[in-house]
Swiss-Prot record:
Post-translational modification: N-glycosylated.
Organism: Influenza B virus (strain B/Memphis/3/1989)
Binding site for Ca(2+): 292, 323
Cofactor(s) needed: Ca(2+)
Summary of activators and inhibitors of this protein: Inhibited by the neuraminidase inhibitors zanamivir (Relenza) and oseltamivir (Tamiflu). These drugs interfere with the release of progeny virus from infected cells and are effective against all influenza strains. Resistance to neuraminidase inhibitors is quite rare.
Membrane topology category: Single-pass type II membrane protein
Positions of region (Involved in apical transport and lipid raft association): 13-35
Region (Disordered) location: 328-347
Enzyme Commission code: 3.2.1.18
Notes concerning its domains: Intact N-terminus is essential for virion morphogenesis. Possesses two apical sorting signals, one in the ectodomain, which is likely to be a glycan, and the other in the transmembrane domain. The transmembrane domain also plays a role in lipid raft association.
One Pfam family of this chain: Neur
Record protein name field: Neuraminidase
Carbohydrate attachment residues: 55, 63, 143, 283
GO cellular component, one term: membrane
Length: 465
């Protein structure tokens, strides 16, 4: 037990009553995750008696006190593990975060200009992360907000449900690529920045900057733009380094309490893997649906064994191609590993697991347009193996219509008391080109209830206003 978690209770007994003094040396972050609450609601009065003395004037009253110390050892917060998903058979519209509906606000209430939003959850709260350009709307710093990488970008967060304004946002670190996750005790934040030829991964655990990882291919080292995944105190992060139009081999970093303890080098179909969206299929396996920006419209699919710390990559075999741009579904001939055509370019895709006692559901998102970042549709496949199943995925509803932007999407899970709620988030970009501001809203859909997905999402933002 760490010294910081020791609570010392000193009880002073006096002839006139009781004084309780509680010395708490645990940190606030620890107390937030403790299930123990100390309450003192009853009064204690020391007993008194009447003294009959023959000569009362010679009696001297002496106050004596006794001190008794009791030490309470409170348990550490638990490491998190994946649990069964909460019950449900369909996703519904849960939340829209559309900051620029409040674009008339100025000063600290102005919405930040952001892109690449994602959500990560701990036992008690979820955080909405994004990469900001260190600018707000309205404002005078719109130039450059369409760039992917520059010296001003930062990883920021707000509590999920808050609008990412200047005053609401926490700035975690300088970064033009990011990730974050909670191990059950503390947050791990990941940020990447630096020149394209020598970028650097930085790790922050709680409030401390703890470790770094250097570029290994000297070609835009970057991470997944969605939540990393933790089990038993170990957090797994996908990274890649290489050409956007050629070879870019990924790795996984195993991180514990902010320190890199192992590198994992995947085998298999490793030519190009980036922007993976990952989650737990079980307590043994992390699965990721990723982006190949160079060769194929199929998604590279990773299986990482957390018991052996080994990973393998193969292409998804389904005839429902999930990247954008993409060819017609079912048009790629040959074995599952065939790349097909229209493989140049791509987009990060949403992916989340529905873990059930007797089966597993894998939920995916893809744009409705085959060529543009417009619209977003939800798909599901129960059981089977994504490496070998060639069947089409089942469409499960429209989250964003063809009239609205559908850019990056991602998966995450909200912690309920006894189960985990799978969700998919969608980045809806306001693309003002290079002459004005360029930012995003976030739409969130979660597993809840039964029936059909009922309603799509609009941002409600008119950039001309």
């Amino acid at each position: 037990m760490l010294p910081s978690t020791i609570q010392t209770l000193t009880l002073f007994l006096t002839s006139g009553g009781v004084l309780l003094s509680l010395y708490v040396s645990a940190s606030l972050s620890y107390l937030l995750y403790s299930d123990i609450l100390l309450r003192f609601s009853s009064k204690i009065t020391a007993p008194t008696m009447t003294l009959d003395c023959a000569n009362a004037s010679n009696v001297q009253a002496v106050n004596r006190s006794a001190t008794k110390e009791m030490t309470f050892l409170l348990p550490e917060p638990e490491w998190t593990y994946p649990r069964l998903s909460c019950q449900g058979s369909t996703f519904q519209k849960a939340l829209l975060i559309s900051p620029h509906r409040f674009g008339e606000a100025r000063g600290n209430s102005a919405p930040l200009i952001i892109r690449e939003p994602f959500i990560a959850c701990g036992p008690k709260e979820c955080k909405h992360f994004a990469l900001t350009h260190y600018a707000a709307q309205p404002g005078g710093y719109y130039n450059g907000t369409r760039e992917d990488r520059n010296k001003l970008r930062h990883l920021i967060s707000v509590k999920l449900g808050k609008i990412p304004t200047v005053e609401n946002s926490i700035f975690h670190m300088a970064a033009w690529s990011g990730s974050a996750c909670h191990d059950g005790r503390e947050w791990t934040y990941i940020g990447v920045d630096g020149p394209d030829s020598n970028a650097l991964i930085k790790i922050k655990y709680g409030e401390a900057y703890t470790d770094t990882y250097h570029s290994y291919a000297n070609n835009i080292l970057r991470t997944q733009e969605s939540a990393c995944n933790c089990i038993g105190g170990d957090c797994y992060l996908m990274i890649t380094d290489g050409s956007a139009s050629g070879i870019s081999e990924c790795r996984f970093l195993k991180i514990r309490e902010g320190r890199i303890i192992k590198e994992i080098f995947p085998t298999g179909r490793v030519e190009h893997t980036e922007e993976c969206t990952c989650g737990f299929a079980s307590n043994k396996t992390i699965e990721c649906a990723c982006r190949d920006n160079s060769y194929t419209a199929k998604r590279p699919f990773v299986k990482l064994n957390v018991e052996t710390d080994t990973a393998e990559i193969r292409l998804m075999c389904t005839e429902t191609y999930l990247d954008t741009p993409r060819p017609d579904d079912g048009s790629i001939t040959g074995p599952c590993e065939s790349d097909g055509d229209k493989g140049r370019g791509g987009i990060k895709g949403g992916f989340v697991h529905q873990r059930m006692a007797s089966k597993i559901g894998r939920w995916y998102s893809r744009t409705m347009s085959k060529t543009e970042r417009m619209g977003m549709e939800l798909y599901v496949k129960y059981d089977g193996d994504p490496w070998t199943d060639s069947d089409a995925l089942a469409p499960s509803g429209v989250m964003v219509s063809m009239k609205e932007p559908g850019w990056y999407s991602f998966g995450f899970e909200i912690k309920d008391k006894k189960c985990d709620v799978p969700c998919i988030g969608i980045e809806m970009v306001h693309d003002g080109g290079k002459k004005t501001w360029h930012s995003a809203a976030t739409a969130i859909y979660c597993l809840m209830g039964s029936g059909q997905l009922l309603w799509d999402t609009v941002t409600g933002v008119d950039m001309a206003l």
